[in-house]
Amino acid sequence: MAYTEVDPEAAAAILKSAGCAPLSAVQSISGGWANSNYLLELEDGERLVLKIWDERSPKEVNRLNSHLELIASHGVPTPVPLLLEGGSRMLEVDGRAWMLLPFVDAPWLAGDRSSMKHLGELMARLHSIPDDGTFISEYTMGTDVWPELFERAEAENTWSPFLRELEAELARLPNLLPAGLPRGIIHGDLFQDNVLASDGEVKAVLDFEDVCINVLASDLVVAFIGCGWEDGVPVEERWTALLEGYESVRQLSENERAALPELYYYATLSVAAWRYRKFRMEVTGTEHSDRYKLMTERLDIPLPFLGYQPRGGAR
């Protein structure tokens, strides 16, 4: 997805700053709703990804880059931005952060057992990284940001049945989850287009912009929401492989297992809430305006392997 057009002079400047060959061709890359991504082909045959951050400030991006260095150093495969002149990993252009990333030549995660198991292993490895004190605790894809939707609906008089249901669910949340669930570094948005895999192996985990300190098991159910369904149908084998890989590195506690149904419920609602905000409150009048309903409809489907049973609401 591209929101910001590439200025050839700026592209040439960042390539020069990274010590790269001149630009030969540029092509927009699909995927992502918060930034613009381009594939750059250089005159020496090298390929790089140019990422332009449309919704994050340069200060936020700079912090994220330090997170990526830490995560990659612990064996989680993720592209780290190239170093530029002066030691920075980004260039500020018209108030936006631009950065160059290594190009990983692999397709999106297909959902085969081996890849799902490997993804589970990598998630557990991520969850085992010690917090260095620089990660935020607000989960921008979770329930933490629901109050912002309510404030906007109140200010603009745009309340809807869906938002009212979210409001009611948020009030119930503290009584539904056990206290003291293990917390740590989570990715927060592990959907298939954020995972590159081939030959049964994850080659790269992408887009850590929602990385934060949160409930670890919530990351596991989000990965199932994003990678464990096929044509609107939950695939039990994908969950089994994901969990098997995860627990080969880190065992879930009994409290975490017991919390999985509620974590799944609220994670699914959170994805729906993100889509509602994006396509009903920010980018309106598109073919995606009802996309949030694809998530709420999933809540009507029982998942015995997760211990989840539908309870109605949020429709």
Enumerate the language-model features and the residues they cover:
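Conserved NTP-binding catalytic cores of kinases and kinase-like/nucleotidyltransferase enzymes
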Residues: 1-83, 198-201, 306-315
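A cross-family kinase active-site recognition segment
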Residues: 110-161, 181-183, 213, 289
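A glycine-centered beta->alpha junction motif in the catalytic cores
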Residues: 97-111, 147, 151-152, 269-285
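All-alpha amphipathic helical-bundle segments outside canonical DNA-binding/catalytic cores
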Residues: 252-264
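Active-site acidic catalytic loop and adjacent metal/ATP-binding pocket
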Residues: 30, 35-42, 49-50, 81, ...
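Active-site activation/catalytic loop segments of kinase-like enzymes and analogous catalytic loops
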Residues: 217-251, 266-283
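ATP-binding pocket architecture of kinase catalytic cores
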Residues: 43-135
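ATP/Mg2+ or Mg2+-diphosphate-binding catalytic cores
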Residues: 152-153, 271-315
